[in-house]
C-alpha cells in the first residue's frame, strides 16, 4: 500500500489496499488526501488538499505574496517521501487574494482526467513489501 497511481497525464492517487488483481485507490481529490507539491516555474512548495470534487484540489495557507499564477503547473515535490519528485499533478486555475487576508487560496485542476480514467499505472519501484 502507498504506491503512487499514475495515468498518462499525471497523478491519480495512491494505493491504500492491494489485492492480488485489484487495489483500492485514494484519489488525490479525496477530502482526506494531502499531497506535497511544488510549482514547476518557481519551485515554491505547498500542500495540495483534496476537496472531494474530481476536478479540483486547493493550495491553502500560502502567503498572499506567493509567486503563483493561473496556468502554473504543480508537480510532486518529493517531501514526505511518499511520491518521487516530478510527477505532474495539476494546473493552477485561480488564485484568490482577499484584501486584508494574509493568505492566498489557490484552486487547481488535476491534469489526469479523474472522472474518465480507463488505464492507470501503479509505481512499484518504491514498494516496501
Each language-model region and where it sits:
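A secondary-structure micro-motif
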Residues: 1-129
Amino acid at each position: 500500500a502507498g504506491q503512487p497511481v499514475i495515468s498518462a497525464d499525471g497523478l491519480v492517487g495512491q494505493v491504500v489496499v492491494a489485492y492480488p488483481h485489484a487495489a483500492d485507490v485514494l484519489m488525490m481529490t479525496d477530502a482526506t488526501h494531502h499531497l506535497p507539491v511544488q510549482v514547476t516555474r518557481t519551485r515554491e512548495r505547498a500542500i495540495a488538499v483534496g476537496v472531494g470534487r474530481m476536478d479540483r484540489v486547493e493550495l491553502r495557507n500560502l502567503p498572499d505574496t506567493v509567486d503563483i499564477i493561473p496556468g502554473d503547473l504543480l508537480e510532486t515535490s518529493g517531501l514526505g517521501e511518499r511520491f518521487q519528485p516530478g510527477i505532474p499533478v495539476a494546473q493552477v486555475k485561480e488564485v484568490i487574494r482577499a484584501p486584508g487576508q494574509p493568505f492566498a487560496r489557490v484552486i487547481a485542476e488535476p491534469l489526469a482526467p479523474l472522472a474518465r480514467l480507463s488505464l492507470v499505472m501503479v509505481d512499484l519501484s518504491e514498494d516496501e513489501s
